[in-house]
Amino acid sequence: MIYPYKEKMPTIAPSCFIADYVTITGDVTIGEESSIWFNTVIRGDVSPTIIGKRVNIQDQSTLHQSPNAPLLIEDDVTVGHQV
């Protein structure tokens, strides 16, 4: 499910793979050739979440951040299962 939060819609590169049952909301940017796997939640509700190119976010991970502290995952990073 991909949806806006406070009028900010996620930006996802066309070459990304987004598995079923993923939730992405708000101020989120996902770079080229990245993959987001089953049951992952990525929130950009209190600060931006920026995911680089060729990033692999594995199953059941939750990515969130604190106010005034954006989350940045640089290029070519793997985030393991259930992080």
Over which residues does each language-model region extend?
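Extreme N-terminal tail/first-helix region
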Residues: 1-16
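Left-handed beta-helix
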Residues: 14, 19-20, 25-26, 31-32, ...
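Active-site cofactor/substrate anionic-group-binding motifs, chiefly glycine-
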Residues: 49
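Active-site beta-loop-alpha junctions enriched in small/polar residues
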Residues: 68
